[in-house]
Amino acid sequence: MKRVRTEQVQVAVSCYLKRRQYVDSEGPLKQGLRLSQTPEEMAANLTVQSESGCANAVSAAPCQAEPQQYEVQFGRLRSFLTDSDSQYSREVMPLLYPLFVYLHLNLVQSGPKSTVESFYSRFHGMFLQNASQKDVIEQLQTTQTIQDILSNFQLRAFLDNKYVVRLQEDSYNYLIRYLQSDNNTALCKVLAVHIHLDVQPAKRTDYQLYASGGSSRTENSSLEPPEVPSPILQNEAALEVLQESIKRVKDGPPSLTTICFYAFYNTEQLLNTAEISSDSKLLAAGFDNSCIKLWSLRSKKLKSEPHHVDTSRIRLACDTLEEEENEEDNTGTEMKILRGHCGPVYSTRFLADSSGLLSCSEDMSIRYWDLGSFTNTVLYQGHAYPVWDVDISPFSLYFASGSHDRTARLWSFDRTYPLRIYAGHLADVDCVKFHPNSNYLATGSTDKTVRLWSAQQGNSVRLFTGHRGPVLSLSFSPNGKYLASAGEDQRLKLWDLASGTLFKELRGHTDSITSLAFSPDSGLIASASMDNSVRVWDIRSTCCNTPADGSSGELVGVYTGQMSNVLSVQFMACNLLLVTGITQENQEH
């Protein structure tokens, strides 16, 4: 009864399809649905599914090429692979042997004799060095007709079987891009009909790499060459190429830095110092009239945060504590004036996050300015004479100062007294600088020496002598290996901190050097001088050629402009060199 009902359903469906004018609708219904498969049929279906795909479909369209094009296309592929030094070209190179054999056999079957001889004589020499290939190549020379091919067991095996070539997925894509770039119909036909490309996945696990060591060749793939495992995995080879490229960049000539110059015009009061914040958003300048001027270098104006306590006023019980709104604080301005010192301001330093500013003055004090409210929040006192310079440690945990009292002092932001006193110089401490690891502090003095101190112990660990005048500027290389010093003797000296000896002496300036800065990669150093020039030096250079002006051979660039005084140089993280200076008074805007 169940069978009759199934037949009734099929008849009803067939009638419906006929009314809808579907062609050959009875065939599939009469065949019925097969619910079982033999193991042989299942294996055949799985093989078809695994073998069919874009990896093995090099050319889906029928390809026909003139016999004369065989030589042109094969020669073009050989030149493409041999001229390239990439890893992909080396992996595709074994494909040339089966391509040559099959192209030659196709020419024997369909091409004129002159074309066959020309093709063989031009390319057969590149395969004679391989012993396993030499025998087949020599047999091709005596093959002139189809009967010669059929009578030769090895050549007939080439036509009866597909030659297997294993390629990595990246190398396979490399080959496909080449085949699509020009007319390669003869090559595409051979690849589609006679060659099986076994494409390996690009990424494999360690277990898969271990498991793939066994042979998976079948009886029909007896022509497949033995697979030689690569001694270097693909990712290791790529890493070596990357490291070699990085080494060539490091050892190569440096790229000249871009210089951005900030000029000060109409400085009625004498300008002593200028510095730019690490994020290039703020510019601070200290003047002889005791004030500090702060500029915004971006479109955003300087706006004070609301503060709820006014310490300059005494509130009475009957007063209403209403905030007095300042229109300037609400809208913001491009410049703020910070007042608090009672003497010339000699140095300023921004915190790493630009949230605060330190300044030192002739009034023997150091002041901390909150850049949120633009007010002086802390006063540090301890020096007995004017303070010439301040510097902040890399993580803004400590700061140091140098003074006319011949000492340098270590401070913390939450203490108004010094934590350490570094005594040992015989004259003023003109400049101070923290090492990148914050464990050491360098000081330069009018006594013509540079000292390196242990920041925690407070003792001197290095003494560098050799300058012929006061030392006015110091700078550590970011890698922590070198210390640069310069001053009134017009010489820039590089000291090796590990050995405590002089590494290089750079000459070229004609006046006192006032500022130094290392590039982020420690390969370049910039120096600013009172001779109104900025010079950039390559400290990695070993060139002994001296320029005509007598400068050191390490000089790679000189910047001179309409300046009367260069105040400072600073390298940014993007290899941008920021320079601040005063323009000549006769220079117009």
Curated annotation (Swiss-Prot):
Extent of the WD repeats: 266-305, 340-379, 382-421, 424-463, 466-505, 508-547
GO biological process: positive regulation of DNA-templated transcription; regulation of DNA repair; regulation of DNA-templated transcription; regulation of RNA splicing; regulation of somatic stem cell population maintenance; regulation of transcription by RNA polymerase II
Species name: Mus musculus (Mouse)
TM segment ranges: none
Pfam families found in the cross-reference section: TFIID_NTD2 (PF04494), WD40 (PF00400)
Protein family per UniProt: Belongs to the WD repeat TAF5 family.
Listed name of the protein: TAF5-like RNA polymerase II p300/CBP-associated factor-associated factor 65 kDa subunit 5L
PANTHER family per record: TAF5-LIKE RNA POLYMERASE II P300_CBP-ASSOCIATED FACTOR-ASSOCIATED FACTOR 65 KDA SUBUNIT 5L, TRANSCRIPTION INITIATION FACTOR TFIID
Localization annotation: Nucleus
Main subcellular location: nucleus
Entry keyword annotation includes Ion transport: no
Binding partners and assembly: The PCAF complex is composed of a number of TBP-associated factors (TAFS), such as TAF5, TAF5L, TAF6, TAF6L, TAF9, TAF10 and TAF12, PCAF, and also PCAF-associated factors (PAFs), such as TADA2L/ADA2, TADA3L/ADA3 and SPT3. Component of the STAGA transcription coactivator-HAT complex, at least composed of SUPT3H, GCN5L2, TAF5L, TAF6L, SUPT7L, TADA3L, TAD1L, TAF10, TAF12, TRRAP and TAF9.
A single cellular component GO annotation: nuclear speck
Free-text function comment from the UniProt entry: Functions as a component of the PCAF complex. The PCAF complex is capable of efficiently acetylating histones in a nucleosomal context. The PCAF complex could be considered as the human version of the yeast SAGA complex. With TAF6L, acts as an epigenetic regulator essential for somatic reprogramming. Regulates target genes through H3K9ac deposition and MYC recruitment which trigger MYC regulatory network to orchestrate gene expression programs to control embryonic stem cell state.
Molecular function terms, GO-annotated: transcription coactivator activity
SMART domains reported in the protein's UniProt record: WD40 (SM00320)
Alphabetical list of InterPro entries matching this protein: G-protein_beta_WD-40_rep, TFIID_NTD2, TFIID_NTD2_sf, WD40/YVTN_repeat-like_dom_sf, WD40_repeat_CS, WD40_repeat_dom_sf, WD40_rpt
Keywords of this entry: Nucleus, Repeat, Transcription, Transcription regulation, WD repeat
